[in-house]
A protein has these predicted regions:
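Nucleotide-activated sugar donor-binding and catalytic core shared by glycosyltransferases
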Residues: 1-228
Length: 228
């Protein structure tokens, strides 16, 4: 409508970074150097966790059959420990899984791959260069409306930004333990493929712009207020 627009960048370009070294993070989280370390991020809302965590845990069991794996499950502040434990008590007893809280970017730093709910988490893992498979389930009516009303090719923010699927997406009935494990296993067993994905993810940071978005926004507001 003729308004002037200035792109100042994205605040996540500033905030998404590890505060610990790799060695410090390994010690802090109890990372196993022998095992492949996989991050499970089922979401911050109960309904998300209920729909996604069971499939993630079953996929974790399949992966454990194929190679030595250690899993990390960061608990969102909106989710109680008791709620998470309700799912873990029904998981395979052979799973090596650690529930964590806080320092999520340091945790991402030491992980080999990630299984994450759609949302900001996939943008954060992309900025951290962590290969991630996106999983998400909506109610049947919401999915129907979304398919007919929302005109976007992808669900994941990294894919929307880059106009291609750098973060594999499994939606609705494709969210199965077998499908999830198949994607992740490729990264666990083929380091060349994993590094290719990491290189693609670097483009996300380039699209979001340089750091300093908050500072530039404040400066722009001040200049506008002063009539400059």
């Amino acid at each position: 409508a003729g308004a002037r627009v200035t792109f100042v960048g994205h605040p996540l370009a500033d905030t998404v970074k590890a505060s610990m070294s790799y060695e410090e993070a390994m010690m802090f989280f109890g990372g196993d150097r022998v095992k492949k370390r996989i991050l499970l991020m089922p979401g911050s809302r109960k309904n998300e966790v209920e729909k996604l965590l069971p499939a993630m845990l079953k996929a974790a069991d399949i992966l454990t059959e194929k190679c030595e794996c250690q899993f990390f499950l960061p608990r969102a502040g909106t989710i109680s420990s008791e709620f998470i434990q309700g799912f873990l008590k029904n998981a395979s007893p052979r799973l090596d899984i650690i529930v964590t809280a806080g320092r999520i970017y340091d945790l991402m730093r030491i992980c080999t791959a990630c299984i994450a709910s759609s949302g900001t988490a996939t943008l954060e893992t992309a900025l951290m260069g962590l290969p991630t498979v996106l999983v998400y389930r909506l109610s049947a009516i919401t999915w129907f409306l979304a398919k007919h009303l929302v005109r976007v090719e992808y669900a994941g923010l990294p894919n929307i930004l880059l106009h291609k699927e750098v973060t594999p997406e499994l939606l609705q009935d494709k969210v199965t333990a077998g499908n999830i494990a198949e994607v992740v296993l490729l990264w666990l067993t083929d380091e060349v493929k994993r590094q290719e994905n990491i290189r693609e993810l670097k483009s996300v940071r380039a699209v979001l712009g340089e750091g300093g978005a908050v500072r530039r926004t404040a400066e722009l507001i001040l200049r506008t207020a002063e009539g400059k």
